[in-house]
UniProtKB/Swiss-Prot annotation:
Record flagged with keyword Ribonucleoprotein: no
Recorded superkingdom: Bacteria
EC number: 6.3.2.-
Species classification: Bacteria, Pseudomonadati, Pseudomonadota, Gammaproteobacteria, Vibrionales
Protein name (record): Probable alpha-L-glutamate ligase
UniProt-recorded Gene Ontology molecular function terms: ATP binding; metal ion binding; ribosomal S6-glutamic acid ligase activity
Residues annotated to bind Mg(2+) 1: 248, 260
Family: Belongs to the RimK family.
Binding residue positions for Mg(2+) 2: 260, 262
Originating species: Aliivibrio fischeri (strain ATCC 700601 / ES114)
PROSITE patterns with a match to the protein in the record: ATP_GRASP
Keywords assigned by UniProt, alphabetized: ATP-binding, Ligase, Magnesium, Manganese, Metal-binding, Nucleotide-binding, Protein biosynthesis
Cofactor: Mg(2+); Mn(2+)
């Protein structure tokens, strides 16, 4: 098969592992920088050009689109969909999961466990907003944040009010969530492919750090999931419409709570913590599904 990987840097661990896994199975692979693509949008023959050449005859596309290029990256992916190329994750599913508020609303509508969450732009009553989520301590997030950037733990009401007011001054949309103390600064990353959890790791925040992101010095280790955690992770990925997803859970006194559903989960942490060939499993999934062009929206989204 001819597989394209939408990635801005082919030396990144995840991208290079996907290239290696695809080539070892005899596939032709090309890394495509979505920002350098340009499109011919027409009703007869939609086209994508890259480095002066038309991109043709691709069987599948693996989107590894960074958060900062979501808009243009998903537009390029949508164009591939319109050309009949099989997307590992569809453009509409990626945009759905990248919007933190939209994804929380979709998960809550389906009864998925999550921390009590408030959302605000310019609240005229910050005290009431904090009361709504159970008071301090609270976690306050900028809606556009990634890798733990723009996430603050406010341990007292006074600190929480100050942070909310500061974020409002940035004209930023903010999310206020209850702090799950019993999680102990750890979360669980469940890697879902095709409706199954194929690997899971526990990420523990560095000493004195409540954020467990590996980019922030957290550590990863193998973890055994409960049946409920497995079921929750699969349901969250399905609600987003993602074939490949990293679902982040917190262990709470009331069961697993979904923090985030990531449409472009990194492979390095999970492969090193579990010893599993996750890149190979993604290529296996493509082999089973791309031939039949099984995509729900066919570029309609």
């Amino acid at each position: 098969m001819k597989i394209g990987i939408l990635s801005r840097n082919q030396s990144l661990y995840s991208t290079s592992r996907l290239i290696e896994a695809a080539e070892s199975r005899g596939h032709e692979v090309k890394v495509i920088d979505a920002l350098r693509c340009y499109m011919n949008i027409n009703s007869e023959k939609p086209q994508i050009h890259f480095k002066g050449e038309e991109l043709v005859d691709y069987d599948a596309i693996i989107p590894r689109i960074g958060a900062s290029v979501t808009f243009y990256g998903t537009a390029v992916l949508r164009q591939f969909e319109m050309m009949g190329v099989y997307p590992v994750n569809e453009s509409v599913a990626i945009t759905r999961s990248r919007d933190k508020l939209r994804s929380m609303q979709l998960l809550s509508r389906k009864g998925i466990g999550m921390p009590i969450t408030g959302f605000a732009s310019k609240p005229d009553d910050v005290k009431d907003l904090l009361d709504m989520v159970g008071g301090a301590p609270v976690v306050i997030k900028l809606l556009e944040g990634t890798q733990g950037i723009g996430v603050v733990l406010a341990e007292t009401r006074k600190a929480a009010e100050s942070v909310v007011e500061a974020f409002m001054g940035l004209k930023a949309n903010i999310m206020v969530q209850e702090f799950i103390k019993e999680a102990g600064g750890a979360d669980i990353r469940c890697f879902v492919i095709g409706g199954k959890v194929i690997a899971a790791m526990k990420r523990q925040g560095a000493e004195g750090e409540f954020r467990s992101n590996l980019h922030r010095g957290g550590s990863a280790s193998l973890v055994k999931l409960t049946p409920e955690e497995r079921k929750t992770a699969v349901a969250a990925a399905n609600i987003m419409g993602l074939n490949v997803a990293g679902v982040d859970l917190l262990r709470s006194d009331r069961g697993p709570l979904v923090m985030e559903v990531n449409s472009s989960p990194g492979l390095e942490g999970i492969e090193k913590a579990t010893g599993k060939d996750v890149a190979g499993l993604i290529i296996d999934f493509i082999e089973k599904n791309a031939a039949t062009k099984r995509t729900k929206t066919r570029g309609k989204g």
